[in-house]
Amino acid sequence: MNPQPSGMTWNLLLLTWLVALISTLSALFIGEVMGQAPCVLCWFQRAFMFPLTVILAIACYRSDFTVWRYALPLTVIGAALAFVHTLLYAGLIPQPIQPCTATGPSCSGAGMTLFGVVPLPALALFAFIIIAILLIIIRRRTTP
């Protein structure tokens, strides 16, 4: 017998979707409105965040609390990419294995910060971690 999800669980699912939605809209704003071209790692992170927005929206609509089964793998992979990107930004990854080319956008330039303080790769990592935590909480609330 599965535990019945409460209204609080649905609110957590909605919050999870909102985090993904805000992340997606922010990435689109930075790229399309501000005109900042994403680097290679940003594209890969987008490939994992953008589908989460759609998947979690459908899960909210259907009250599908098993969404963690297919959203959590995307989140973990996206978080791993964001972690590598954050290490790259911090200068902890050696130069020879940096994925950005000399002709493409820089992963570690000054334009990769929010308000000149918070690195965008760290924000992406934070968003993926928050989504993962919320999905795990949803799983624990709905799985016996």
Curated annotation (Swiss-Prot):
In which broad location class does this protein mainly occur, judging by the first location in its UniProt entry? membrane
**Gene3D superfamilies given in the database record:** DsbB-like
The family database entries (InterPro entries) matched by this protein are listed as: DiS_bond_form_DsbB/BdbC (IPR003752), Disulphide_bond_form_BdbC (IPR012187), DsbB-like_sf (IPR023380)
UniProt keywords, alphabetically = Cell inner membrane, Cell membrane, Chaperone, Disulfide bond, Electron transport, Membrane, Oxidoreductase, Plasmid, Redox-active center, Transmembrane, Transmembrane helix, Transport
The UniProt entry's GO biological process terms, in alphabetical order, are: protein folding
> One GO cellular component from the entry?
plasma membrane
Q: How does it sit in the membrane?
A: Multi-pass membrane protein
Q: Which residues cross the membrane?
A: 10-29, 44-63, 70-87, 116-138
Q: Where in or outside the cell?
A: Cell inner membrane
Q: Name one GO molecular function term.
A: protein-disulfide reductase activity
The SS bond pairs are C39-C42, C100-C107
* Family label: Belongs to the DsbB family. BdbC subfamily.
Q: What does this protein do?
A: Required for disulfide bond formation in some proteins.
From the Swiss-Prot or TrEMBL record, give the protein name: Probable disulfide formation protein
Origin species: Metapseudomonas resinovorans (Pseudomonas resinovorans)
